[in-house]
Amino acid sequence: MTIGLVGKKSGMTRIFTENGASVPVTVIEVEPNRVTRVKTVESDGYSAVQVTSGSRKAKHLTKAAAGQYAKSGVEAGRSLMEFRLAEGEEAPEVGGNITVSLFEAGQKVDVTGTSKGKGFQGAVKRWNFRTQDNGHGNSLAHRAPGSIGQCQTPGRVFKGKKMAGQLGNERVTVQSLEIVRVDAERNLLLVKGAVPGATDCEVIVRSAVKAR
């Protein structure tokens, strides 16, 4: 199964097992994902299903997006997300809903989100560089990165050099997290461990690649 769900991170809590062990979980609220389009090999060159969730005012839509929602007869959502279909995988109908019942407790999933932005940070925090000596003549350079290259040859800093810069606010995927509980009545997924992003940010839940 390659179809996933678009949800919203609600925060973290913990639950207790029958043995009394405390398990940290992330609560993901998954409103029913509405199918807006089904792509096929004949018409688009590949098989995929396009979904949306939540709601959005019509005045905030582009003409292209408004036309697509009108064509499919689906209420406009926050964003459009596409999931590729595996060969032979059955596609849902346009206008139908995909709910949390897609997953079950004990299943492994990959969760994708946008990590918290931490602004401009130095090499020690951004790349876990060790700090320089506190003594032995060193002053004002305890958290400096040190040498970043050579001299006249090559006369430049190589691309990809680990230096200070923007930390966070990037797309991150955490793989093989276990679903502890599925609450179909309240549209909730309880996933063991932490997932990327701040509270109320959008996350994508897919079946784990390494478990397929």
Curated annotation (Swiss-Prot):
PTM-bearing positions, type N5-methylglutamine: 152
InterPro entries per UniProt: Ribosomal_uL3 (IPR000597), Ribosomal_uL3_bac/org-type (IPR019927), Ribosomal_uL3_CS (IPR019926), Transl_B-barrel_sf (IPR009000)
This protein's UniProt keywords: Methylation, Ribonucleoprotein, Ribosomal protein, RNA-binding, rRNA-binding
HAMAP family attached to this UniProt entry: Ribosomal_uL3_B (MF_01325_B)
SUPFAM superfamilies, per the entry: Translation proteins
GO MF terms held by the record: rRNA binding; structural constituent of ribosome
Gene Ontology biological-process entries: translation
Record's protein name: Large ribosomal subunit protein uL3
